[in-house]
C-alpha cells in the first residue's frame, strides 16, 4: 500500500474510530460520571437550582441506572432556607435501541425507588408534597409520530401525596393541544393515600388507596375521553372534614369518615358531557355506625338527562330500590324537562337512629322497633307534579298514604294543588316526647283514622276531612288564607271523644255541629 493510500485510509477511518471510541467511552463509568457532572452543572446554572447526581451506570444498549438525584432551590419566602424539590434514591430504565430509529419507544422496565418531592412554587395551581416508595411500569408501543402510548403494566406502591390548592391562580394564556392516546392494560396502586386541602384549608379530603386495580383503559387526551373496563378498590378509606365546623354526634355532614371501602366498577366511560358507569359492588362503613352492605346499579348521563337504573342499596338491616330519570333542565322556568322517580325502602330503627343523633333521648328510645316502609312514585317538574303513590308505614305507630297533583309546587304564590290523604295512627307515644312537659300532661294522641282532601290555590287552603276515633266520628271542612288571615270551619261530630285528645279537663263525648269564621285570630 502506498503512502498516499495509507493517508487516505487513515483519514477515512479516523472519524469512524473516534465515533466508536466515543460510543465505547460513554459506557465507561468515569466518562459517564464526568458527563453527568457537566450536565448537572449546566442545568443548575440555567434553572437556578442545585442539581446533583451521586452515580450513573449505562449498560449497552440503553439500560440506565441513576442513583442519588437531588434537586434543591431557594425558598420563595425565606432566603436562607432551601426547599428540596426532588430526592430520588434510584431509577432504572431499560429501553430497546432499534425501535428509537422509527420514532417508537419500547420500555422493558422503568423503576423509580424512594422518591421525595415538593413542587414548592413551581406549579401555581397547587403545592404537591409527598413520597413514593416505588413506581414500576412496562410500555411497549410508544409511537412518537402517531402520539400513541400503550402501558402494559403500571404499579404504584407506597405513595403519600399532600396537595394544597391555591386560591390565586394566574390565567393560563398558553394554547396547546394534546393529541396523545393512551391504552392501559393494567394498573395497580398499593399502600398509598392522597390528601387534598382546599384554599385556606377550609375543606380537607383524604383517600386511602390500599389496593386498587384498573384494567383495559383507553384515554384520549384531546377529546377528554376516559374509558375503563373495570376498577376494583379494596380496603379503602375516605375522610372529609370541614375544618371550620364543629363535630356532631351521629351522621355529621361536615365530618364524614368512610372506611373498609370495597368498590367494583365496570364499563366506566366519560367524555364530557357523557358519563356511564356500572356499579358492580360497593360497600363501606361510616364512623357514625352506618354500614353500607351493598350498592349496585347503573348510572347514565348525557348533556340532557341523568338516568339511574336498577339502583339497589342495602345495609345489614335496611334496603332501598330506586329507578330515577331526570332531565337536567327540570329546574328551568321556561320549557322545563321531566323527572320520573320510583322509590321504595325499608328502613330499620338502627339505621334511622344513626341519623337522629340530635333528637331527644326519649324520642329515640321510644321509636318503634319495626322497620319504616316508604314508597314514592312521581313524575313532573317545577311547573307540574303528579304523585301517583306515596306511602309511609311504621307498624304499630302509623300508616299514611297520599296521591295527587300540583302546579308550581315550589312557588307558594302560584301553587295549585289537589291531594288525597289517608292516615291511620296507633301508638304515637314517641311523638309526645317532642312536646314540652306541660303539653305532655295536657295533650294525648290516640289511635285515629283520618281521610282528607286538600286543595291549595296560592296561600289559600281548603281541607275536607273525615276523622274516626274509638266510637266517635267527625266530619268537617276548613279554609285558611295566609295572605288575608281569613279562616272558616264547619264541623259535624258524633260522639267524638274529646277527652282522648285533651287530658285533665273532664271533657266527654261531643255530638253536634260547629261553625267558625273570622280573620286575624291567633289560634294559639
Positions of the model-derived regions?
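Extended terminal
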Residues: 2-13, 20, 369, 381-385, ...
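N-terminal type II signal-anchor transmembrane helix
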Residues: 1-48, 76-78
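Amphipathic hydrophobic-ligand
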Residues: 46-50, 78-93, 123-138, 156, ...
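Outer-membrane beta-barrel pore domains and translocons
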Residues: 157, 282, 313-314, 344-346, ...
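Flexible, solvent-exposed coil segments and beta strand-coil junctions
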Residues: 68-70, 74, 115, 171-172, ...
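Membrane-embedded beta-strand positions of outer-membrane beta-barrel proteins
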Residues: 110, 154, 343-345, 376, ...
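Flexible beta-edge/linker motif
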Residues: 55-166, 177-201, 206-208, 213-249, ...
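Transmembrane beta-strand segments that form the barrel wall of outer-membrane beta-barrel proteins
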Residues: 278-284, 305-312, 384-392, 458-467, ...
Amino acid at each position: 500500500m502506498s503512502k498516499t493510500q495509507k493517508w487516505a485510509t487513515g483519514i477515512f477511518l479516523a472519524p469512524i474510530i473516534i465515533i466508536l471510541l466515543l460510543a465505547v467511552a460513554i459506557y465507561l463509568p468515569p466518562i459517564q460520571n464526568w458527563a453527568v457532572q457537566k450536565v448537572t452543572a449546566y442545568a443548575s446554572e440555567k434553572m437556578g437550582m442545585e442539581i446533583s447526581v451521586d452515580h450513573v451506570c449505562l449498560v449497552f444498549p440503553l439500560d440506565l441506572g441513576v442513583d442519588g438525584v437531588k434537586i434543591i432551590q431557594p425558598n420563595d419566602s425565606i432566603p436562607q432556607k432551601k426547599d428540596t424539590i426532588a430526592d430520588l434514591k434510584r431509577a432504572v430504565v431499560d429501553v430497546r435501541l432499534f425501535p428509537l430509529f422509527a420514532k417508537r419507544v419500547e420500555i422493558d422496565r422503568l423503576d423509580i425507588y424512594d422518591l421525595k418531592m415538593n413542587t414548592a412554587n413551581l406549579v401555581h395551581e397547587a403545592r404537591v408534597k409527598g413520597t413514593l416508595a416505588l413506581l414500576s411500569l412496562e410500555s411497549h408501543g410508544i409511537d412518537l409520530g402517531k402520539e400513541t402510548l400503550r402501558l402494559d403494566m403500571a404499579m404504584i406502591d407506597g405513595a403519600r401525596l399532600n396537595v394544597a390548592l391555591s386560591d390565586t391562580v394566574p390565567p393560563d394564556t398558553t394554547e396547546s393541544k394534546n393529541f396523545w392516546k393512551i391504552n392501559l392494560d393494567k394498573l395497580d396502586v398499593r399502600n398509598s393515600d392522597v390528601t387534598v386541602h382546599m384554599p385556606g384549608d377550609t375543606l380537607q379530603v383524604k383517600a386511602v388507596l390500599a389496593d386498587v386495580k384498573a384494567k383495559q383503559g383507553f384515554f384520549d387526551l384531546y377529546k377528554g375521553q376516559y374509558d375503563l373496563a373495570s376498577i376494583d378498590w379494596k380496603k379503602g378509606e375516605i375522610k372529609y372534614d370541614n375544618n371550620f365546623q364543629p363535630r356532631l354526634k351521629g351522621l355529621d355532614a361536615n365530618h364524614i369518615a368512610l372506611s373498609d371501602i370495597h368498590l367494583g366498577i365496570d364499563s366506566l366511560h366519560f367524555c364530557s358531557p357523557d358519563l356511564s358507569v356500572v356499579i358492580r359492588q360497593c360497600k363501606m362503613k361510616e364512623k357514625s355506625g352506618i354500614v353500607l352492605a351493598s350498592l349496585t346499579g347503573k348510572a347514565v348521563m348525557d348533556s340532557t338527562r341523568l338516568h339511574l337504573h336498577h339502583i339497589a342499596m342495602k345495609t345489614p338491616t335496611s334496603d332501598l330500590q330506586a329507578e330515577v330519570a331526570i332531565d337536567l333542565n327540570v329546574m328551568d322556568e321556561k320549557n322545563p324537562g321531566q323527572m320520573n322517580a320510583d322509590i321504595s325502602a325499608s328502613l330499620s330503627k338502627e339505621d334511622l337512629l344513626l341519623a337522629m343523633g340530635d333528637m331527644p333521648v326519649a324520642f329515640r328510645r321510644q321509636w318503634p322497633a319495626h322497620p319504616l316502609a316508604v314508597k314514592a312514585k312521581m313524575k313532573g317538574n317545577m311547573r307540574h307534579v303528579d304523585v301517583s303513590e306515596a306511602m309511609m308505614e311504621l307498624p304499630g305507630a302509623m300508616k299514611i298514604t297520599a296521591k295527587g297533583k300540583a302546579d308550581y309546587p315550589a312557588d307558594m304564590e302560584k301553587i295549585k294543588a289537589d291531594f288525597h290523604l289517608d292516615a291511620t295512627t296507633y301508638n304515637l307515644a314517641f311523638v309526645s316526647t317532642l312536646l314540652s312537659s306541660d303539653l305532655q300532661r295536657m295533650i294525648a294522641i290516640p289511635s285515629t283514622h283520618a281521610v282528607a282532601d286538600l286543595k291549595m290555590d296560592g296561600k289559600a287552603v281548603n281541607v275536607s276531612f273525615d276523622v274516626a276515633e274509638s266510637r266517635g266520628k267527625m266530619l268537617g271542612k276548613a279554609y285558611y288564607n295566609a295572605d288575608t288571615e281569613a279562616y272558616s270551619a264547619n264541623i259535624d261530630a258524633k260522639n267524638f271523644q274529646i277527652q282522648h285528645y285533651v287530658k285533665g279537663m273532664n271533657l266527654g263525648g261531643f255530638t253536634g255541629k260547629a261553625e267558625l269564621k273570622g280573620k286575624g285570630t291567633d289560634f294559639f
